[in-house]
Amino acid sequence: MLGIILSTILLSDTVATDRVQNLDEVVIVSEARRGRKRSVKGQVASIDEHLSELRNVSLVRRGSYAWEPVVNNMQTERLSTTIDGMKIFYACTDKMDPVTSYVESGNLQSISLNSGLDGNPQATGNIGGSLDLKLRKAGFDNNPFHASASAGHEWNGHVQVYGADAALSSHRTYLNAGAFYRHADNYKVGGGDELQFSQFQKVNVFANAGLRLAEKDMLEGTLIFDRATDVGYPALNMDVAKAEGLITSLAYKHLFRKASWETKAYYNHITHVMDDTTRPDVAIHMDMPGDSWTAGVYSLLTTALRQHDLALNYDLYYNRLFADMTMYPGGAAPMYMVTWPDVGTLNTGLALTDNISIAHNQSLRLSAKVAWQQQCLHNEEGYHALKVFFPGMTDAYHQTTGRIAANYALSIKNYALSIGAGWGSRAPTVTEAYGYYLNNTFDQYDYMGNPSLKNESAVELNGAAKLSVLNSQLSVEGNVFLFSNYIIGQFENRLSAMTVGAEGVKVYGNISHATIANLSLTWDWQISEHLSWNEKVSYSSGRDADGDPLPLISPISWQSELQYQNQRFQAQATVKGNTRQSSYGEKYGETAAKAWTILNFSAQYQFIVHNSQFIVSAGLENLFDKHYATYADWNHIPQKGRNIYMNLTFEL
């Protein structure tokens, strides 16, 4: 197969057309496109609000900032998140800084989702799914000059958003750059009470540049600097003084008649500093900094051979993770502890994807990846601290992981059907393998890593069907993941907790099997040319080897949306909610979330003045000022109460 791809490339001599990835879903960030999802707040919306538009995505919320994406009811450990194909790793042991928090809406063109084991080429360990945040680039041969500015305000929490960017483009070069600023005070929950420590502020600047070396050869570079300060986390015991990311890349592209070849080298550095100095009645003050450094490269070839659309990707990255903690007990000497022992991870992998057109109404998608990684512990103090509990451990480990998936799709008149299956595995994360006394406020236990963990694996089965009748569509889709060696924290009564107030200690371990299943039903009705109605109901289930519920599995959720749209104006009313969480992970420290329902309104109007486009949007969220928390709100911190927002975007 590789020989066929290379032969095709060598025989080609003209510019290729753009290849389109087979994605489960895309949400547009920077511009509206018919048939593609977009947040009602437009580009002023936060990354978290854009992510919430994706069908299989929910978000774990620990405060107003940096929500953790969850795909198919699986959190960060079982997902792959890349930024334009680049691997980036968070630097906080408490997962307070997901990868998505280090970019802004102004940086992005779109966010793409591959559900389950059929990941994007650079994805590794993506049992639940993979997210790729596509950067917004001016590109060659586009508008010679383009500029835009955005401003937004939300009354609840006095959220202020300001952004501006400009772009230059020609046949030989392009450049686009911009800056974004967000600031929020504490917000009020339903009923009017202020939620302390829910404030944040953030600055983001970025630049993308391209140079055409020859007609078919191009260089592209990216620089993003993102800095959040004074970030409150009301669900946790600590806040964040600084979360800072520097993201850089340099890519070379060569185009052929029916193929393209891109090679990108990248480097990023994430710094995260937790802070409890603003909290009242702190028993023991703690400093908890963390750092993540990643350097990597990938090389991607794409081509079309008759009925085949092929993609071959090689990637390699090296990541270092280090975190420590210093405790300052009153009247005693400071106590120092390494929580991530400077773990260096070298990972390399090869992926192949083939989209096959069997007939005009049938297609088959095949994808596979194999990856090898080696991890070394570079901090002697952290290594020897773990070795006390695991005498047989060494300071170096290696794992081999992989995935393979197939999906068949058939379309006949008003019917569409797809079925798929896959198998994949993932290596334990640094926290799961080498974390040292990491306090988890979800269940109030200290967690210990386990270097002897086995790789986790899963078999995925999925299917979807769609029926179109007159002006309506009825869709049903579902998947089930059958896990082996599922990794989760397990009680260890022989160890004593270190954190003040902790219930005890858990050590990560493998359980023989677990199951996560998801099912959704969607109905879309185009009532008239301008009026549409959408209904959706989702059900999920997660069980461990003993048949007990897994934590953070969504209860039944539902949403009903009525939308009016013409060329320049659109408005929508949305009612959404969850049922009471009757099946929850009590065994794992979870408590049940109550049922809730809220009503939102939004509207948007576009107009042109002297060749400049203006977009005004406004909305009312949680109309009845409902006091509620979702199942994914950490420690049931309540959501915002009634909120009014207004945004303005100007494009020249």
Stretch-by-stretch model annotation:
Residues V203, G210-L213, D354-N355, T401, ...:
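Conserved C-terminal beta-signal and adjacent last beta-strands/turns
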Residues A184-Y187, G192, Q196-K202, R212-T294, ...:
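Flexible loop and strand-edge segments within Gram-negative outer membrane beta-barrel domains
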Residues S357-L364, V370-Q375, N379, S468, ...:
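Gram-negative outer-membrane beta-barrel transporters
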Residues R227-T229, H269-V273, R320-G330, W372-A396, ...:
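Surface-exposed extracellular loop regions of Gram-negative outer-membrane beta-barrel proteins
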Residues L51-K87:
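Extracytoplasmic beta-strand/coil segments of soluble accessory domains associated
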Residues Q43-L51, W67-V70, T82, P98-S101, ...:
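N-terminal periplasmic accessory domains that precede
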Residues K87-G116:
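Short acidic/polar hinge/loop motifs at secondary-structure boundaries
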Residues L236-R257, M288-T294, T339, V343-T345, ...:
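Outer-membrane beta-barrel signature, preferentially recognizing the C-terminal barrel domain
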